Amino acid sequence: MQKFTFFVSCAKGIELLLKDELERLGISSQEKLAGVEFEGSIKDAYKVCIYSYLASQVMLKVATDKVINQQDLYEFISSINWMDYFAVDKTFKIIISGKHYDFNNTMFVSQKTKDAIVDQFRNVINQRPNIDTENPDNVIKLHLHKQFVNVFLCLNIDSLHKRSYRQFQGQAPLKESLAAAILIKAGWLEELKKHQPILIDPMCGSGTILIEAALMAKNIAPVLLNKEFKIFNSKFHNQELWDNLLEIAKNSQKVTNAIICGFDIDNNVLDKAQRNIYQAGVEDVVTVKRQDIRDLENEFESEGLIVTNPPYGERLYGDQLDELLDIFNGFGDRLSQDFYGWKVAVLTSFADSIKEMQLRTTERNKFYNGAIETILYQFKINEHAKFKHETQLEKNIRIAEASAQKSDEHIDFANKLKKNLKSLKPWLKQTGLECYRLYDADIPTFAVAVDVYSEHIFLQEYRADATIDQNIAKQRFYQAIYQIHKTLDIKYENIHTRVRQRQKGKEQYQKENDKNKFHIINEFDAKFYVNFDDYLDTGIFLDHRKIRQLVAKAAKNKTLLNLFSYTCTASVHAALKGAKTTSVDMSNTYLEWGKNNFTLNNIDAKKHSFIQADCISWLKTNKDKFDVIFLDPPTFSNSKRMDDILDIQRDHELLINLAMDSLKKDGILYFSNNYRRFKMSPQILEKFNCENIDKICLSRDFLSNKNIHNCWEIKYK
């Protein structure tokens, strides 16, 4: 039987797997870049076309030569006796791959090749074969490399990776040949030797991995699924041999007891997978159902293999990146808890997702899904697989340290911290303050507020604009954590973080966490409990420092009504100056916190009033009069404890009028709010003596944010 040289192409990264596959077919080959080469018969080449799960193209090598100009190219192509390869009545097309030093235009190479072939036929028999780019009888491929041109005749007209079963696919489809490659690399062929092989794809998408696994389990030759497969129509083609080999392949299929299961959280994707499974004819082996990967359970009697190709991070998830990472964290937990003894393989281009699994890899291999470089991470689930449990603090430190290596942007942030601290030092020394704002989005790219509480930092991230890449914003936030630790010499565990955004309803009063860890801070002659972790705010508003002093001074040895009193810090300052205070707030939690603040300052809380109530409703029924009132409402609130929604711009006139009804004629109302676009009601300005005291209430550490609050002193005329 006549021997030829064949080149079998494949995706980069699977050459060795393809070489092994050909060995199983009885064909010895040599590994090349993006393929293998072997000496063999047409029958050998047909077997590759029929049985290979990994090959893309099987090509008969025609000729190779060095070519340095267009005339060389024409003469080289003309030197090949094309009439030995196909008849004049057979159509052909030309495809070009690779790069040549002297030819930048592949269209030119294709045209010159076509001219040489057509001219040869015309010169010899006065007829010419026709070009057909859609459905040719033969495909001639030229691969360019440096100054060499390699000419091949393709046995398969379309790529072998096309199986025809995939009529429905998701956003990032995995090539069938690559799915087969990762299954083989992960050990599916060895698994098939077991009494009952088991394979799970917990993020199965449109089902490609499941179907390829089933084809191998049932020994279905891939070419049998390709309804549009077309073998070349060359003079070397042997139709009888081809038909006989196809018949052998059909008769080689077998029944399997393999268990192949797929899961996905998306019902639409599962519907596509189910239709593809039926199209491939493997519905007797493959089952799919809806399930979150974080709820994956081991319902099997023996160990098996888990292979999956999850969505590629930012490419599909975008600003849902945190959700993706959480999914992988949960996946890693399920594997270590419930799949002891199993082997796992995950193909992804997104390394951060693998880190979240917190499992030790046993092997890593590079593959390409088209142009996308991916890594196949393999794991063996045993007592050595799981990394030590990573606490949230350890995770934050790891991400912060890694983020600092990704760019140098944070250097400017560090320099700004140093500059601000140097500027504030004389004032801090003069006042004796240990709690202050050090930084407030001074650099637009680092939109955070840094509040110093002695040896602790409260780091607040302002919600990034929708136009800002959420992943970049997250990276900068962690870079800020890194620089606070490094520049200010603050322990990582003393850096407490929060994202600032509008709170709705009961969220304003709900706990963020449940650590119940309180710290004591000093403000002038008062002490306060603060909590950095459990609530949205710490328990004290640093920007209200000056207005607390004004209120306390005005209320000395008098009566004070503190409305929306929060943790009663203003009441404490006033009580220390001899005031009798009444604090009103909707939250019993904060009122209890306020009582503890009184006790901390050796003030008998029983001699003061703490009232849990909606301030508006309470004011409407209050009959007492006060010397000083401090009214500091939120900008917006729709708590279920309130009779109505509070909107400070809309409702401040009502609030002030009600508060003034509880004020003595010679008393003072201090009104404050944080709504940046606040406009005082003309009716209030007309009715009372109103003085804006924003500048008086602005502390040295808040000068860069002059609109942080609106403060008014209001008296009767």
Curated annotation (Swiss-Prot):
Q: Identify the Pfam families for this entry.
A: Methyltrans_SAM, RlmL_1st, THUMP, UPF0020
- Top EC class, one word: transferase
Q: Which PROSITE patterns match?
A: THUMP, UPF0020
Q: Does the keyword S-adenosyl-L-methionine apply?
A: yes
Q: Which reaction does it catalyse?
A: guanosine(2445) in 23S rRNA + S-adenosyl-L-methionine = N(2)-methylguanosine(2445) in 23S rRNA + S-adenosyl-L-homocysteine + H(+); guanosine(2069) in 23S rRNA + S-adenosyl-L-methionine = N(2)-methylguanosine(2069) in 23S rRNA + S-adenosyl-L-homocysteine + H(+)
User: InterPro entries of this UniProt entry?
Assistant: 23SrRNA_methyltr_KL (IPR017244), DNA_methylase_N6_adenine_CS (IPR002052), RlmKL-like_Mtase (IPR000241), RlmKL-like_Mtase_CS (IPR053943), RlmL_1st (IPR054170), SAM-dep_methyl-trfase (IPR019614), SAM-dependent_MTases_sf (IPR029063), THUMP_dom (IPR004114)
Q: Does the keyword Chaperone apply?
A: no
Transmembrane regions listed in the UniProt entry? none
Where in the cell? Cytoplasm
> THUMP domain: which residues?
44-155
Q: Which terms in the GO cellular component ontology are assigned?
A: cytoplasm
User: Which E.C. number(s) belong to this protein?
Assistant: 2.1.1.173, 2.1.1.264
What keyword terms does UniProt attach to this protein?
Cytoplasm, Methyltransferase, RNA-binding, rRNA processing, S-adenosyl-L-methionine, Transferase
- Return one GO MF term: 23S rRNA (guanine(2445)-N(2))-methyltransferase activity
PANTHER family membership: RIBOSOMAL RNA LARGE SUBUNIT METHYLTRANSFERASE K/L, RIBOSOMAL RNA LARGE SUBUNIT METHYLTRANSFERASE K_L
The function of this protein is: Specifically methylates the guanine in position 2445 (m2G2445) and the guanine in position 2069 (m7G2069) of 23S rRNA.
Protein family per UniProt: Belongs to the methyltransferase superfamily. RlmKL family.
Protein name, as recorded:
Ribosomal RNA large subunit methyltransferase K/L
Which organism is the protein's source?
A: Francisella tularensis subsp. holarctica (strain LVS)
